[in-house]
C-alpha cells in the first residue's frame, strides 16, 4: 500500500472515531424509582407515591413531569463515594438552562448530600408557591444575585442511610431564575463560614423537586464541572 493510500485510510479511521464518539445517547423515559448512569451523568428518580415521568436526554439534560405526588425528585449529576470533601474534589460548578412550570410547591435547584456529618443541601434558583425558609443564617452574593441562607433539622426522616435525623442547608436566591451558572463550591464555603459543616461528598446534582403538587420542567442544559 502506498503512502497516499495509508494517509487516506488514516483520515477515514479518524473520521469514523469522531462520528462514533459524537453520537448522542438514546433518550430514555422512566416512571418509577430508579438510579443509574446515562450519557456520563448519574441520575435518579425518587418518589414516595404519585405519577411521575423522567426522560433522560443527552449529557446532563432531562425533562420531568409529576402529578398527585407526595414528594418526588428528578436529578442528574454526580454521585461520589463519600471519601472526599469538596475541598479535595476541587471547585464544583453547574451551568444550566431550563423551563420550569411548577403547579404548586416545587424547586429548581442544585441538590445533594454529605456524610460525616450527614447533611442534605439545596441551592434553590426558582420555586413554585412556596419559597423555602428556616433558621436564618445570613446572606451572600454569588452568580449575579443574592442568596439567603437557612438551616433546618429533619427528625427521623428518610435519608441516604435510611431513617435518620440530619441537618438541611439552604441557599435560596432572592429573585427567581431558570438559567445561569451556580458556583456550587462558593455556597459550600459560605455555609462552612457560618458554622454549617460539610462532610464527605456523596452527591451533587441539578434537580427538580415537587412536593404535594403537579408540574413539569425541561432541563435543556446541565453541565457539571468538577475540579476546575
UniProtKB/Swiss-Prot annotation:
The keyword Signal applies. GO terms for molecular function: endo-1,4-beta-xylanase activity. Residues 29-222 form the GH11 domain. The keyword Hydrolase applies. Its EC number is 3.2.1.8. Residues 1-27 form the signal peptide. It is an enzyme of class 3 (hydrolase). Keywords: Carbohydrate metabolism, Glycosidase, Hydrolase, Polysaccharide degradation, Signal, Xylan degradation. GO terms for biological process: xylan catabolic process. Pfam families: Glyco_hydro_11 (PF00457). Pathway: Glycan degradation; xylan degradation. Belongs to the glycosyl hydrolase 11 (cellulase G) family. This is Endo-1,4-beta-xylanase A. It comes from Bacillus pumilus (Bacillus mesentericus). The lineage of its organism: Bacteria, Bacillati, Bacillota, Bacilli, Bacillales. The gene is xynA.
Amino acid at each position: 500500500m502506498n503512502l497516499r493510500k495509508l494517509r487516506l485510510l488514516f483520515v477515514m479511521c479518524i473520521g469514523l472515531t469522531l462520528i462514533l464518539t459524537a453520537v448522542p445517547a438514546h433518550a430514555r423515559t422512566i416512571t418509577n424509582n430508579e438510579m443509574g448512569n446515562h450519557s456520563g451523568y448519574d441520575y435518579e428518580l425518587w418518589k414516595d407515591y404519585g405519577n411521575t415521568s423522567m426522560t433522560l436526554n443527552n449529557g446532563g439534560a432531562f425533562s420531568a413531569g409529576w402529578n398527585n405526588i407526595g414528594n418526588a425528585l428528578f436529578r442528574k449529576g454526580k454521585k461520589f463515594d463519600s471519601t472526599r470533601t469538596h475541598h479535595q474534589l476541587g471547585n464544583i460548578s453547574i451551568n444550566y438552562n431550563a423551563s420550569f412550570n411548577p403547579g404548586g410547591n416545587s424547586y429548581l435547584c442544585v441538590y445533594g448530600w454529605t456524610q460525616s456529618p450527614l447533611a442534605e443541601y439545596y441551592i434553590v434558583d426558582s420555586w413554585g408557591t412556596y419559597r423555602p425558609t428556616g433558621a436564618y443564617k445570613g446572606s451572600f452574593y454569588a452568580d449575579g444575585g443574592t442568596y439567603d441562607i437557612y438551616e433546618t433539622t429533619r427528625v427521623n426522616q428518610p435519608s441516604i442511610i435510611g431513617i435518620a435525623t440530619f441537618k438541611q442547608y439552604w441557599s435560596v436566591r432572592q429573585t427567581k431564575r431558570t438559567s445561569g451558572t451556580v458556583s456550587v463550591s462558593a455556597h459550600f464555603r459560605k455555609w462552612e463560614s457560618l458554622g454549617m459543616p460539610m462532610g464527605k461528598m456523596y452527591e451533587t446534582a441539578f434537580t427538580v423537586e415537587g412536593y404535594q403538587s403537579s408540574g413539569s420542567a425541561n432541563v435543556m442544559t446541565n453541565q457539571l464541572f468538577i475540579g476546575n
